[in-house]
A protein has these predicted regions:
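Zinc-dependent deaminase
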Residues: 1-19, 39-41, 89-175
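Short loop/turn microsegments at loop-to-beta-strand junctions
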Residues: 4, 26-27
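Small-residue (primarily alanine) positions within well-ordered alpha-helices
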Residues: 12, 16-19, 29, 47, ...
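Short beta-strand scaffold segments in enzyme catalytic cores
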Residues: 27-39
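Residues that line or immediately flank small-molecule/substrate-binding pockets and catalytic motifs
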Residues: 33-34, 85, 109
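Short beta->alpha transition motifs characteristic of CBS
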Residues: 44-53
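A short, polar/charged loop-to-alpha-helix boundary motif
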Residues: 53-64
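Helix-adjacent hinge/juxtasegments
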Residues: 63-100
Length: 175
């Protein structure tokens, strides 16, 4: 595993932690522009994002990072950029990655329910589409997976009580 991949994935994991603190699913992403740093030939993070799905079902970490990268660069074509994301992209995000012409996607843990970078679908390398990406999987996978497991475990462990009015006599039932 390339040291730089770990460095950029660590940054994505930090955005995933921020998402969890907001109550969103802990997925984080960063977009790195290749060869754009202050030193000749170095790479730099140009955008980042975490899930913000509480009011927008399309506000996945990848979508937020892509939107921000396009705004920062003032263009839609991100062919000189790489995406680092803690969870394998879903079909929607994979479609956006293809449309943005990103050259490479690096993800942490696989998504057996909606993974579109090879686990369930392989949209990023579908020969019927106009663009394909290099995919690197498993970078800091255990850390990424642990964030998700702990987040959903905490949600399940919180006891939710609901009070139902069961009749006209004012009786209630709490579950």
């Amino acid at each position: 595993m390339i040291t730089q991949d770990k460095e950029f994935m660590s940054a994505a994991i930090n955005y995933a932690r921020e998402a969890a603190l907001r109550g969103d699913v802990p997925v984080g992403a960063v977009i790195v522009q290749k060869g754009s740093g202050t030193e000749c030939g170095t790479d730099r993070i140009i955008s980042a994002g975490g899930n913000r799905k509480s009011s927008d079902p399309t506000a996945h970490a990848e979508m937020n990072a892509i939107r921000e990268a396009c705004r920062v660069l003032d263009r839609w074509n991100l062919s000189d950029c790489e995406l680092y994301v803690t969870l394998e992209p879903c079909p929607m995000c994979a479609g956006a990655i293809v449309q943005a012409r990103m050259r490479r996607v690096v993800y942490g843990c696989a998504d057996p329910r909606a993974g579109a970078a090879g686990t369930l679908y392989n949209i990023l390398n579908d020969s019927r589409l106009n663009h394909r990406c290099v995919i690197t999987s498993g970078v800091l996978a255990e850390e990424s997976k642990a964030l998700l497991i702990n987040f959903f475990r905490e949600r399940r462990d919180k006891k939710i009580t609901c009070t139902y009015h069961t009749g006209t006599n004012g009786s209630t039932m709490t579950m």
